[in-house]
């Protein structure tokens, strides 16, 4: 089975413009989270869309689904997320397992709730690549020169930009394999390995690259929100 996992567990309000977490802010005529869920509703091969939110916001997220997505609510599961990204993925997979016991073939297309400009093409590319690989990471080519500094004061290295990519989401993983790999990590490793695909890479798994889009903006600052509003208005 193919599932979607929307990571909406953040509670940060550091934009300073609302008491709402970023994923619940209005973008155009509806919240950012709703825009994101709508993109996954368009892909018929996805069995369920599981949204992991902070426990304090579960009821609010359920109300948004009732209000904006009433025709699709049977495909959407709202569940309590974890304390960080990977534990939220873990909680999402546990919700999938509760819906239907996991099989080795089950995959979940995980995505940041605050990336509402994901395209159907990106979702479908992830699903297609995941059929033949252990995991899939969505990336775009690095357009700026990346410098490395180990002390924050002087340049240590300037890697070859031709080999560098900027990571986005979705990231698509095999559910059972993620649970096995994540469960094998020590507490110290879990603190360091905050990215699901990085876990697959260090464990020697096959992680394919899917082509992202520069428009696949992650809304984390006031400036990002202004850009997103401009993009919505143009559409």
Where are these regions (language model features)?
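N-terminal glycine-rich phosphate-binding loop and ensuing alpha1 helix
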Residues: 1-59
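Short beta-strand segments
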Residues: 5-9, 52, 111, 138-141, ...
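Residue-level signal for inorganic ion chemistry
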Residues: 6, 33, 92, 112, ...
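Short aromatic/basic micro-patch
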Residues: 26, 117, 172, 218-219
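Conserved N-terminal catalytic core of the sugar/cofactor nucleotidyltransferase
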Residues: 34-105, 185-188
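Conserved core of the sugar-phosphate nucleotidyltransferase
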Residues: 104, 117-210
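Short aromatic/hydrophobic "clamp" motif used to bind/position activated sugar donors
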Residues: 108
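Hydrophobic helical membrane-anchoring modules
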Residues: 216-235
């Amino acid at each position: 089975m193919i599932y979607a996992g929307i990571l909406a567990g953040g509670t940060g309000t550091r934009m300073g413009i609302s008491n709402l977490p970023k994923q619940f802010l209005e973008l155009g005529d509806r919240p950012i989270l709703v825009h994101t869920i709508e993109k996954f509703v368009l892909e018929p091969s996805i069995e369920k869309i599981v949204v992991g939110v902070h426990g304090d916001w579960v009821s609010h997220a359920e109300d948004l689904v009732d209000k904006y997505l009433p025709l699709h609510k049977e495909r959407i599961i709202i569940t309590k997320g974890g304390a960080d990204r990977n534990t939220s993925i873990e909680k999402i997979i546990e919700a999938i397992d509760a819906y239907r016991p996991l099989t080795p073939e089950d995959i979940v297309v995980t995505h940041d709730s605050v990336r509402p400009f994901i395209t159907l093409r990106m979702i479908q590319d992830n699903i297609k690549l995941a059929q033949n690989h252990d995991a899939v990471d969505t990336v775009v080519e690095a357009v700026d020169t990346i410098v490395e500094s180990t002390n924050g004061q002087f340049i240590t290295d300037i890697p070859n930009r031709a080999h560098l990519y900027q990571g986005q989401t979705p990231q698509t993983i095999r559910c059972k394999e993620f649970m096995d790999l994540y469960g094998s990590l020590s507490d110290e490793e879990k603190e360091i390995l905050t990215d699901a695909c990085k876990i697959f890479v260090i464990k020697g798994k096959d992680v394919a690259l899917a082509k992202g889009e520069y428009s696949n903006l992650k809304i984390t600052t006031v400036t990002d929100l202004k850009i997103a509003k401009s993009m919505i208005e143009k559409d």
